[in-house]
């Protein structure tokens, strides 16, 4: 929301308070990368400054003093890798054939668990795209033995097994099979509680880990899944304190840290490579591991090329000259390449990174730098969608407008290649709704109005920018998205509303204090407190966390419901974008200050290959 005229604000506004935010420390990167990186260590405080960049008369503006770009363009352009050599691709292709044979060579003993473990391993290693047919055959086989009590380790098992059943419940549900969580009722004792022994054996711990993972794909009103999550969480927290550091303890910590909704497939693959030998001791895990490492590094070479393109786009667009905005294009690209590692989807990854960067630039213009008069002109120009509309814009806005205009049109061209039709009208409608939502927030500050929670939340679902970050990137994919399917994904569909709502709520819990420090009073927290006199910040946060928890279950249902009219593949990338953006808010606002977690994510999933 923008700082505008000096109209008096509501009593709950913070513009009359200190505009200095808390100091954020930028810690050094790991030594392997540090010598070639340079960034300006900044204290991202909020202050008032005078600028004469747009007119003869000085204009008073707020600037958030965001730290500069961490990833120097010269460094990005200097990246090189040996993994583009054909020999690596040839070796990977041979291994793909050998792994396919592994799918076909499973014996009758423990055949259900073996198939599930094989599917899980290729998915967690990030190589599942090579084995779609094998995965479907394996899961069809497992599902054919599924019953109201779950499954055992093998087709001839007399008794159902918690480990196999929990793993199957999660895996089958994620692949769209109609499986009920009621099977978990059969693993409770006579008192209706999940039972376990006093001695935590490795087998039991693995069973409870799979129960925990299954509980994260719960649908609304699945009480047994809620009970499973509570029980398994308590059990695993105790177990990890007692068992020695091992592949099992690391897997527990990783899964409890990232769960499912903030887990990134490429990050998981990087972590799982070190442990999967121990996880699949009864199979030829060496071939899987070698293939996973080769695929990781071959994709790493593609990441370097894409990152160089993105960095040139950022530099050529003139964004590097805008010192009042956040520069997070590398971080956004990292998130995109952590959820989609298909070499054919370069346009998706680059499009997502560009759209997110444009959102961030506009967020900083509307939040801090732009005046109300400028914002009205810019909003009108976006709606006209014509370069001549920039005539009355200040110089800095002219450049931004043209980059938005050219990038959106370029993305529409990419979408036409894959969808076979012009999609620019979808994009224009999304941008108009997005920019209108920003103007509404600016007007709230200008008038001193603090909206109701519901009014803020509904507008905030649009102003978050999820629709912009998703729409054009997914249209570049080789997944048919005709109008009737697209309407189920984009705003105001139920799917889009849930995703946008989750991210708006989660984002506000991470940003509201910094936003309030620079005079942006309206947030889910402040609006809830205003609607409920006497409510504390803790009350508001508890309410919002409960909302997010329930919305997550509804979101799971919208993606995975068995009678889905829209294929999971059509919604999967939009769902994964939600996971990626959610990941950035896991610890704090990773988009305003690039914290150590975000920096390490860039290093481990983009900049550094894995040792072969």
From Swiss-Prot:
Main subcellular localisation: plastid
Enzyme class: lyase
Chain ranges for the short sequence motif DDXXD motif as given in the UniProt record: 363-367
Gene that this sequence comes from: TPS-Cin
GO molecular function, a single term: terpene synthase activity
Pathway(s) it belongs to: Terpene metabolism; oleoresin biosynthesis
SUPFAM superfamilies (alphabetical): Terpenoid cyclases/Protein prenyltransferases, Terpenoid synthases
EC number: 4.2.3.108
Binding-site list for Mg(2+) 2: 363, 367
Catalytic activity as recorded in UniProt: (2E)-geranyl diphosphate + H2O = 1,8-cineole + diphosphate
Protein name (database record): 1,8-cineole synthase, chloroplastic
Domain free text: The Asp-Asp-Xaa-Xaa-Asp/Glu (DDXXD/E) motif is important for the catalytic activity, presumably through binding to Mg(2+).
């Amino acid at each position: 929301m923008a700082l505008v005229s000096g109209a008096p604000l509501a009593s709950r506004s913070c513009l009359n308070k200190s505009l200095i935010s808390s100091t954020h420390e930028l810690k050094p990167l790991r030594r392997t990368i540090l010598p070639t990186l340079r960034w300006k260590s900044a204290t991202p405080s909020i202050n008032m400054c005078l600028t004469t960049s747009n007119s003869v008369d000085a204009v008073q503006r707020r600037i958030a003093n965001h730290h500069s770009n961490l990833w120097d363009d010269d460094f990005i352009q200097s990246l090189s890798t040996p993994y583009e050599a054909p020999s690596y691709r040839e070796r990977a292709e041979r291994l793909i054939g050998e792994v396919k044979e592994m799918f076909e060579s499973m014996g009758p003993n423990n055949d259900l668990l073996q198939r599930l473990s094989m599917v899980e391993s290729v998915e967690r290693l990030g190589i599942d795209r090579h084995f779609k047919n094998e995965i479907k055959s394996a899961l069809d086989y497992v599902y054919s033995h599924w019953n109201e009590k779950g499954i055992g380790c093998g087709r001839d098992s007399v008794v159902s097994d918690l480990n196999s059943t929990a793993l199957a419940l999660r895996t089958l549900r994620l692949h769209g099979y109609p499986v009920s969580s009621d099977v978990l009722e059969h693993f409770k004792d006579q008192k209706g509680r999940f039972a376990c022994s006093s001695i935590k054996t490795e087998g039991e711990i693995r069973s409870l880990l799979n129960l925990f993972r299954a509980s994260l794909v719960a649908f609304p009103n699945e009480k047994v899944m809620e009970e499973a999550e509570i029980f398994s969480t308590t059990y695993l927290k105790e177990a990890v304190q007692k068992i020695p550091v091992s592949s099992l303890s690391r897997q527990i910590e990783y899964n409890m840290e990232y769960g499912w909704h903030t887990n990134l497939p490429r990050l998981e693959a990087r972590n799982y490579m070190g442990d999967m030998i121990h996880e699949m001791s009864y199979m030829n895990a060496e071939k899987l591991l070698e293939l996973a490492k080769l695929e990781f590094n071959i994709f790493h070479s593609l990441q370097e090329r894409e990152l160089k393109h993105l960095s040139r786009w950022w530099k050529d667009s003139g964004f590097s000259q805008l010192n009042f905005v956040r520069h997070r294009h590398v971080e956004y690209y990292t998130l995109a390449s952590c959820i989609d590692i298909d070499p054919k989807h370069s346009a998706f990854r680059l499009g997502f990174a560009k759209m997110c960067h444009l959102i961030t630039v506009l967020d900083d213009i509307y939040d801090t730098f732009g005046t109300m008069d400028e914002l009205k002109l810019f909003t009108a120009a976006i709606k006209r969608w014509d370069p001549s509309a920039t005539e009355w814009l200040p110089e800095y806005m002219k450049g931004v407008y043209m980059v938005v205009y050219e990038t959106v049109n370029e993305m529409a061209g990419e979408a036409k290649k894959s969808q076979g039709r012009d999609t620019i009208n979808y994009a224009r409608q999304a941008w108009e709704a997005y920019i209108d939502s920003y103007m509404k927030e600016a007007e709230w500050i200008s008038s001193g109005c603090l909206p109701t929670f519901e009014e803020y939340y509904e507008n905030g679902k649009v102003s978050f920018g999820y629709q912009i970050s998703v729409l054009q990137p997914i249209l570049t994919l080789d997944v048919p998205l005709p109008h009737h399917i697209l309407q189920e994904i984009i705003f105001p569909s139920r799917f889009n509303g849930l995703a946008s709502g989750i991210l708006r709520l989660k984002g506000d819990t991470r940003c509201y204090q910094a936003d309030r420090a620079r005079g942006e009073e309206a947030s889910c927290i402040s609006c809830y407190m205003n609607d409920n006199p006497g409510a504390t910040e803790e009350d508001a946060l508890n309410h919002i966390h409960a909302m997010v928890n329930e919305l997550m279950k509804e979101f799971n249902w919208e993606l995975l419901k068995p009678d889905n009219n829209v294929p999971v593949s059509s919604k999967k990338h939009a769902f994964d974008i939600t996971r990626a953006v959610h990941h950035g808010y896991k610890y704090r606002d990773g988009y305003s200050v690039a914290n150590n977690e975000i920096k390490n994510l860039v290093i481990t999933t983009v900049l550094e290959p894995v040792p072969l």
